[in-house]
UniProtKB/Swiss-Prot annotation:
GO cellular component: cytoplasm; cytosol; cytosolic large ribosomal subunit; nucleolus
Gene Ontology terms, MF aspect: structural constituent of ribosome
Comp. bias regions, Basic residues: 18-31
Lineage: Eukaryota, Metazoa, Chordata, Craniata, Vertebrata
Organism: Mus musculus (Mouse)
Identification of the protein by name: Large ribosomal subunit protein uL3
In-chain residues carrying the UniProt-annotated modification Tele-methylhistidine: H245
Length: 403
């Protein structure tokens, strides 16, 4: 029989071809939200680092629904977002060929973790990046030139973006090289945008100045890499019958004799994962504050709610697996996001006008789970664990050694 008995849709989408390793590790923003001059000046994106997942309990606020006023348990992802540092301003002009850079101005002082991004091997380099450039800010001729640049940007540019980098020293990661990106400034006139950006040169921008509670955002990143995979795993094609000669996790017919080539649309083995992806409509459940010192005391209770008053941080017992402790500001997103732990993620304001009731729903968290994510966690805090377990042998030994 030369034809199949039943028709079936093809396996796997051709919309994501070529399925190869991403050329960039950090998610690229290919389009920023549309500018609206009537709104106040604001940033449209931010960088964060995926820490891990937990679950929450909340009450649904959806009048008319069967689940209204009922408690639901939902999975959430914690993305650590330490403040970003603004180190430059870029002006763009609109041309018939699209946007073109007009002027770029960098700050006088740039940290080493940012400079590392401009070198392949920081250890062997002379570390001279920006040493000549920063002198512009110190002599009169340089200052005049910078002022001239800012004025010409106000006159000719239509789009203003800032150059900002992350602060790796605040994170529990080994990497020292900061991630650097351009973030579009929206709202107000071009002059207002430029003044706003100028005021914030060398300043830190926290995440709560970019996003708000209950906002819908987009997450751009590179997925978890899986390596070289067979056709069944990569394209989810059907396994052949058990008695098939020469393997069954294959495609039986890869095309006609002529044309004597294999079409691009035929499922083949190859790279799976580590692809650049944009996921839209991730709801922010909480924008949490990092650890802070108040009246000489370290305040950690950023996972307490109105219903759960226990003094606990967002970190599960033992920290997030394969990440560590989240000590900075963080964002809690509904559901999962792309990438492995420690992966840098680009968080962008939504391109769409959100009108759905689910998108506009107010989120009121009742409980955030902080049990250990390594094994079957039972305790929310160390105090709860100590109260249940009682005095342990290791505590007694430590006491004796101390005495």
């Amino acid at each position: 029989m030369s034809h199949r008995k039943f028709s079936a849709p093809r396996h796997g989408s051709l919309g994501f071809l070529p399925r190869k390793r991403s050329s960039r590790h950090r998610g690229k923003v290919k389009s920023f939200p549309k500018d609206d001059a009537s709104k106040p000046v604001h940033l449209t994106a931010f960088l964060g680092y995926k820490a891990g997942m937990t679950h929450i309990v909340r009450e649904v606020d959806r009048p008319g629904s069967k689940v209204n006023k009922k408690e639901v348990v939902e999975a959430v992802t914690i993305v650590e977002t330490p403040p970003m540092v603004v180190v430059g301003i870029v002006g763009y002009v609109e041309t018939p060929r699209g946007l073109r850079t007009f002027k770029t101005v960098f700050a006088e002082h740039i940290s080493d973790e940012c400079k590392r991004r401009f070198y392949k091997n920081w250890h062997k380099s002379k570390k001279k990046a920006f040493t000549k450039y920063c002198k512009k800010w110190q002599d009169d001729t340089g200052k005049k030139q910078l002022e001239k640049d800012f004025n010409s940007m106000k006159k000719y540019c239509q789009v203003i973006r800032i150059i900002a980098h992350t602060q790796m020293r605040l994170l529990p990661l080994r990497q020292k090289k900061a991630h650097l990106m351009e973030i579009q400034v929206n709202g107000g006139t071009v002059a207002e945008k430029l003044d706003w950006a100028r005021e914030r040169l060398e300043q830190q921008v926290p995440v709560n100045q970019v996003f708000g509670q209950d906002e819908m955002i987009d997450v751009i990143g590179v997925t978890k890499g899986k390596g070289y995979k067979g056709v069944t795993s990569r394209w989810h094609t059907k396994k052949l019958p058990r008695k098939t000669h020469r393997g069954l996790r294959k495609v039986a017919c890869i095309g006609a004799w002529h044309p004597a080539r294999v079409a691009f649309s035929v499922a083949r083995a190859g790279q799976k994962g580590y692809h650049h992806r944009t996921e839209i409509n991730k709801k922010i459940y909480k924008i949490g504050q990092g650890y802070l010192i108040k009246d000489g005391k370290l305040i950690k209770n950023n996972a307490s709610t109105d219903y759960d008053l226990s003094d606990k941080s967002i970190n599960p017992l033992g920290g997030f697996v394969h990440y560590g402790e989240v000590t900075n500001d963080f964002i809690m997103l509904k559901g999962c996001v792309v990438g492995t732990k420690k992966r840098v993620l680009t968080l962008r304001k939504s391109l769409l006008v959100q009108t759905k009731r689910r998108a506009l729903e107010k989120i009121d968290l009742k409980f955030i789970d902080t049990t250990s994510k390594f094994g079957h966690g039972r305790f929310q805090t160390m105090e709860e664990k100590k109260a249940f377990m009682g005095p342990l042998k290791k505590d007694r030994i430590a006491k004796e050694e101390g005495a």
